[in-house]
Amino acid sequence: MTPLAAKRPLQLNDQGQLRHFLSLDGLPRELLTEILDTADSFLEVGARAVKKVPLLRGKTVCNVFFENSTRTRTTFELAAQRLSADVISLNVSTSSTSKGETLFDTLRNLEAMAADIFVVRHADSGAAHFIAEHVCPNLAIINGGDGRHAHPTQGMLDMLTIRRHKGDFENLSVAIVGDILHSRVARSNMLALKTLGCPDIRVIAPKTLLPIGLEESYGVRVFSDANEGLKDVDVVIMLRLQRERMQGGLLPSEGEFYRLFGLTEQRLKLAKPDALVMHPGPINRGVEIESAVADGPQSVILNQVTYGIAIRMAVLSMAMSGQNAQRQLNAEEAN
């Protein structure tokens, strides 16, 4: 498995600033660090009595989710509101798309209503890239998750969580455990960790839930024995089993998966004593993680949600700024 081809010029303006946020593939380390630093500065906003800054005042953010979501959609809404933007969240099940209107026509109509940023989640890999390149290139397009391909804001909020608790990435061992085959979060995390200089990225899963070619594509170490893979790691990122994307025969049973790969208190002892426990949600307790671990002292799962708002504020504000700068450059060139 190789990542979708990096489209660096598509994501960045002529000055190298973010204008769309579609994937972490091909983005330079300096830009990922800038996103993390910007998000760090926005965490203070969440502690204020009035949780608002005027960076997107007068702008409209459209959340267009073709897949169900709670955390991602809600945190994007909060992020946009804290930046003082107007927010529209499209309920696809009751929208014109359910009456036969194409994705292309739906988005072009929203663009005609003077939207400035689209946050799009779609079941098809590459949907956000297609929209940014062929449908609405003059708007800032943010990928809220596309098929198995990418979930870049989740990847970045996970990196912010790790950095705030562990500091630099250069001496860390990070294990990603679970359904790697169907996980866009795993792909974004592997890319982010590699770009930020993490020297030891471990992927732990049954062989039936491992894509082919992970080692070559992402520079990771692959383990099919959880006990071996978790030894002395600094961070454990658990992933749920995505039954809705599976075909029959990939797993004998959820009980068997929990026995061999579930993160229990006993299995967590194989990691370093201060290892972080992370999970992008939704959590399936007793399937990939024990409740005592999910709610335990090493868990930073709720911190991930908090940091997600700050990361999405950073991405929204940076993409809008980069898109505005490109428009100005285009106008100057036209004159």
Swiss-Prot record:
* Catalytically driven reaction(s): carbamoyl phosphate + L-aspartate = N-carbamoyl-L-aspartate + phosphate + H(+)
Q: Name one GO biological process term.
A: amino acid metabolic process
Recorded metabolic or biological pathway in which this protein acts:
Pyrimidine metabolism; UMP biosynthesis via de novo pathway; (S)-dihydroorotate from bicarbonate: step 2/3
Write down the InterPro entries for this protein, in alphabetical order: Asp/Orn_carbamoyltranf_P-bd (IPR006132), Asp/Orn_carbamoylTrfase (IPR006130), Asp/Orn_carbamoylTrfase_sf (IPR036901), Asp_carbamoyltransf (IPR002082), Asp_carbamoyltransf_Asp/Orn-bd (IPR006131)
Quick one: which residues bind carbamoyl phosphate? R71, T72, R121, H151, Q154, G281, P282
Got a GO cellular component term for this one? cytosol
Question: What general EC class does the enzyme of this chain belong to?
Answer: transferase
Q: Which residues form a coiled coil?
A: none
A molecular function (GO) term: amino acid binding
EC number, UniProt record: 2.1.3.2
Q: Which domain of life is it from?
A: Bacteria
Q: Per its database record, what is this protein's job?
A: Catalyzes the condensation of carbamoyl phosphate and aspartate to form carbamoyl aspartate and inorganic phosphate, the committed step in the de novo pyrimidine nucleotide biosynthesis pathway.
Which family does the entry's similarity section mention?
A: Belongs to the aspartate/ornithine carbamoyltransferase superfamily. ATCase family.
What PANTHER family has UniProt attached to this entry?
ASPARTATE CARBAMOYLTRANSFERASE (PTHR45753:SF6), ORNITHINE CARBAMOYLTRANSFERASE, MITOCHONDRIAL (PTHR45753)
User: What is the protein name for this chain?
Assistant: Aspartate carbamoyltransferase catalytic subunit
The source organism is Ectopseudomonas mendocina (strain ymp) (Pseudomonas mendocina)
